[in-house]
């Protein structure tokens, strides 16, 4: 997980969470514009950052935990605005559940309402995700080496 920061001269902290299947680069122009008014932290999940192709996305819960640790360490656990789009809303919901964080305003843009079950095994998660998202997940849903090999072939 990597954090890109803009507008550090501003006091209000906005954390932006991108959707699934895309990288943080899709939100970069918006983050730069918002940095004219806010201190923006744009999050790049493991497995979705082109600059870190060796990383693997584990779960929205893992990304939220790591983001929470980062915010507590660097900003005392306070987020003024938490913005998530699409699958980023899954991470957003997990961040909201973190008792160590204080979030003033939340924007959940395009939030899916499907529950993410607490499945312990990786195989079980793969089967669950395959049936709910189809073949696309099987091919592209494991960011990192598998996606890199697949994209190199097409």
Q: Predicted regions span which residues?
A:
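Conserved HGGG/HGGXW glycine-rich cap/lid loop of the alpha/beta-hydrolase fold
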Residues: 4-52
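Conserved alpha/beta-hydrolase catalytic His-Asp/Glu region
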Residues: 116-119, 135-154
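Structural signature of beta-strand start/N-cap positions in the alpha/beta core
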Residues: 13, 39, 79-81, 104
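Active-site catalytic pocket residues across diverse enzymes, especially alpha/beta-hydrolases
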Residues: 34, 99-100
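Gly/Ala-rich beta-loop-alpha elbow adjacent to hydrolase catalytic centers
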Residues: 83-92
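Active-site signature of alpha/beta-hydrolase-fold catalytic machinery across serine-
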Residues: 29, 94-98
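Flexible "cap/lid" loop of the alpha/beta hydrolase fold
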Residues: 97, 103-135
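Active-site loop/oxyanion-hole signature of alpha/beta-hydrolase fold enzymes
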Residues: 42-83
């Amino acid at each position: 997980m990597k954090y890109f920061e803009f507008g550090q001269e501003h006091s209000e902290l906005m954390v932006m969470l991108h959707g699934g299947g895309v990288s943080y680069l899709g939100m970069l122009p918006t983050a730069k514009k918002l940095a004219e008014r806010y201190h923006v932290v744009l999050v790049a999940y493991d497995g979705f950052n082109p600059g870190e192709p060796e990383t693997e996305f584990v779960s929205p819960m893992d990304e939220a935990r790591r983001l929470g640790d980062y915010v507590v360490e660097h900003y005392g656990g306070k987020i003024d605005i938490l913005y998530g789009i699409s699958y980023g809303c899954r991470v957003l919901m997990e961040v909201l559940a973190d008792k160590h964080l204080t979030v003033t305003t939340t924007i959940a843009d395009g939030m899916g309402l499907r529950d993410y079950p607490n499945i312990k095994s990786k195989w079980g998660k793969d089967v669950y995700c395959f049936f709910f998202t189809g073949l696309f997940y099987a091919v592209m849903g494991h960011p990192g080496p598998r996606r890199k090999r697949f994209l190199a072939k097409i």
